[in-house]
C-alpha cells in the first residue's frame, strides 16, 4: 500500500501528466546504496519501487535543469557534485509525500540555468541568409515600440523596467523554437564554422544573425535621428515632431531575471504557434522600410509612465487573437525591430503617430507580434493546445527526397492509331521477319499479314478523312444475291447422309441396286409393259405448248397411281397411307423405311444430326437457292465436325512422362479384394496363357516388311530384354504398323550419351519380335531385301538356344514386385532394375577369367627363385672399391682413345706429302713466269719513250703475288691441283688484254 501511495503522489507532483524517463537518464544517476531488505520476493513491490525512483529522478531533473533536458544529451559528462546532490535528494525525499513535499523539494533544489556559449565574432560577416530566425527580444521591443507610439520618449530607467517580459516557467522541458528575422539586408558569414552538435550550430547562426542585424539597425537609427533633428530645427514646431532616439538598455542580467520571475508568477499568457518563413515574408512586404517612413507630427508627444503601464496591462490576449484572425496588418504601420546586442546593447524606439486613435494602432500590432513570435524559453503550444515538437528546424529539402504522389507518377500514354501507323511504316514486321536470324513460324507470318491489312485500311481511312468523305457511321453490309445449287452442293448433301452412318449407307446402296435389277427382270418378264413402266419426267424439256395440256397430265397421273395400287395388291389398311403420299416421295418411303436397311440407335448425337440432314431424293423441278455459309463462317462446313475443335488424347488427360497413354485401355485402380481374386484365378488357370497363344497363332498369314539387316562389322552381342520391354515392343508394333525405326527410337532410352548395350536398333526389334510374338510363325516377309533378311534371321536363330520358345506377355520368372497393374504401358526407362545386376554379373565373369589366366604365370615365377636360391651370391663391394674400379676403367678408356687419335694423324700426314710437293713446284714456276712478264713490259715502255723523245718514266711497282696458304690438313687430288695451276696461268693473260 505504501508503494502504491508513493506512486500516486509522484504522478500528482507533475500536474497529472504522464511522465516517462528513458533508461539513458537513469543510467546517468545510478544508485549504489544497499537495499534495506535484500530478500524481497514480491516482484510487484520491486517494480513499483523502481517506478518510484524513476519518477523522483525525473522530478529532480526538471527542477535542476529548467531550460530543458536536451542539455544532458549534448553534454559530455556530469559533474560529480550534481550526482552527489541527487543522492542526497533521494535519501531525503524518497519517503516523503503530500503537498509539503512539492514545496520543500522545489526549494531544496538549486536550478542550473544554461548560458549559451557565444563563439568569437568572425572578421567579416557577409551574406547571412535572409530567412534567419527571429529572437525573442524582437517581440519585447515591438511591444515597447507600440507603447512609445502613445507616449513621449521615456527615460532609460523606465524603459528598463518594461523591456524584458518573460512568460511563466514550466516544469516540462523547453523546446528550441525556430526563429525568423525580419531584416531584409543580412550578411552571410565568410567561413562557416563546424559546431559539435545541431543545437550549437543553430545557436551559432542565431548569434551571428543578431550581431549583423544589430549593426545595421544602429546605423539606420543614427541616420533617422539625424534626419529628424534637422527637420525639427528647420520647422521649429514642437507639436508635430517624430523623434527616434537610441535607448541604452541596462546590461545587468541578474535584475532582469528577478523582474521576469515576479511577472511570470503573477500572469501566464498562452504562446502562439511558430512563425513560418512564408508568413514572415508577407509581413516584410506589407511593412514599409525605414527609408520610406513618413514623418507624422502629433500635437501631444508626452506620456507619463502610468499611462504606459495602463496600456500594457489593458491588453487582452483572447481579444487580440480574434482581432488577429479577422484583421490584417495596417499598410501604414511602421515597426523597426532591433535585437539586443551583446557588447553594446542599443535599442531603437520607433515612434509612429497616425491620425487614427492610439488603441486602434496598439492592439493589432501587439496582437500580431504576440501571436506570430513565440518565446524561446517556453514550449510552443498551438491554438488547439497540442505541444509543438522538440526540435523545429527549417531545412530546405531537395526535390529528389520528396516521395512522389500518385498524381505525379508518369502515366504511359496509349499508342494512338497515327503513332502505330507511323511505326509500322518505318519498320514493318514482314521486313524484320525476312531478316530474322532464327526460325520463323507461320503464326508470325500471319501476324505480319494482318498487320499489313490493318495498315492499308488505316491508310485509306486517313486519306478519306483528309478528303472529307469519311463518316463515323458505317453503312450496313449488303447481302449478296444467292446462287443456284450446283452438282457439288448435291454431293455435299449426300455426304451428310454418308457421314451419319457410312456402313448402313453402303448396305442401302447394295439393296437399292438389287431392287433395280429385280425391276429390270420384272420388266422383261411382264406381258403388259404398261403396268411396270413409269412415264419419263419432261419437266426440264417442257415446251410452251405443253402448258395448255396440264390438266390432261394430272388425270393421267391419277389413273397411273390406281394401276400401281391394283398391281401390288395393297391391303385396305395400307391404302390410306400410300395414297396420301405423293408420287415423288413414294420411292423415298419404300427405300428408307424398309425393314432391311432401317437402323435404330440410342445415340442422342446421331438423332439430332438426322434432323439437320436434308431429305434424300432427286433434284426437284424448281431451281433451289443455296445459302452461302461462307458469309457467316470462315470455311465451308463440309461436315458437322468442321467447326468442332479437335482434341488429342494427350490433351484430354495429363499422362505421366514415362507412360503411354491410352484412354480406352486404362482401367480404374483395383481394390485389395479384386487383386486377391485375380491372383487366385491366375493360379488356378495356369493354362490360360497357352490357350491365348494358340488363339493368336491360329491367325492367318500376313506380310511384314523387315528392316535392312546389319553388316558383319556391325554385329554386337545381344542386349538382354526384360518382360516389360517385350510387352512394350508388341504394343508399339500393333500401334504403329510395324514401323521398325520408330519403334526402335521409342524403345531406346532418352539421353545424350546412350550406352551401346541399351541402344535398340530396328534389327534387334525385328529379331525379338520373331521370338516373342506367336503370330510371327505365319508371317511372310516382303520387300527388296526380304531374302537377305531371312538368311540373317536364320543365322541368328540358329545360335540362340530358345528358338522355338514363345514368351508370354508376363514370364513366370518375373519377380513379384515387378508385376504391377497396367505395367503394359511402362516405358523401358521405368523398368531398368536388371541393368546393374547384369553389369555386376559381367564384371564378375571377367574377374574370374583373369584369375584363371594369372594362375599358371604365378606357378612359373614361384619355381624360378627356388633354383637360383641354391647358388652362392658374390660378396657386395664397398663404396671405396666401387670408386677405385670406376677410376681404373676411365683411365683405360682414355688411353685407348689417345692411341686411336695418334694413328689417325699419321695416316693423314702420309697422304698429304705428294700433294704439298706439287703445290710448291707450281708456285715456283708461277713466280718465274711473272718475273719474265715484268721484264718484257719494262723494255717495251723504255723503247717507246726514247723514240718519242720523252724522258723515261719509272715503271710502276707491281705487287708480288703470294702463293695460297694451303694447310697441311687439306687434301687435294691431282686433278684439283692441275685446275689450280691453269687458273693461275689465265690471270696474267687477262691483265695483258686489258
Swiss-Prot record:
GO process terms (BP): DNA repair; DNA repair-dependent chromatin remodeling
Taxonomy, superkingdom: Eukaryota
Chain positions with Phosphoserine modification: 298, 378
Comp. bias intervals (Basic and acidic residues): 158-171, 178-191, 204-233, 254-265, 288-305, 672-693
One Pfam family linked to the record: HSA
Residue ranges of coiled coil: 880-912
GO molecular function: chromatin binding; DNA binding
Region Disordered, residue ranges: 122-275, 288-308, 671-693, 857-880, 975-994
SMART domains registered for this protein in UniProt: HSA, SANT
HSA domain segment(s): 475-548
Subcellular location(s) per record: Nucleus
Main location: nucleus
Family the entry assigns: Belongs to the EAF1 family.
Function: Component of the NuA4 histone acetyltransferase complex which is involved in transcriptional activation of selected genes principally by acetylation of nucleosomal histone H4 and H2A. The NuA4 complex is also involved in DNA repair.
Protein name: Chromatin modification-related protein vid21
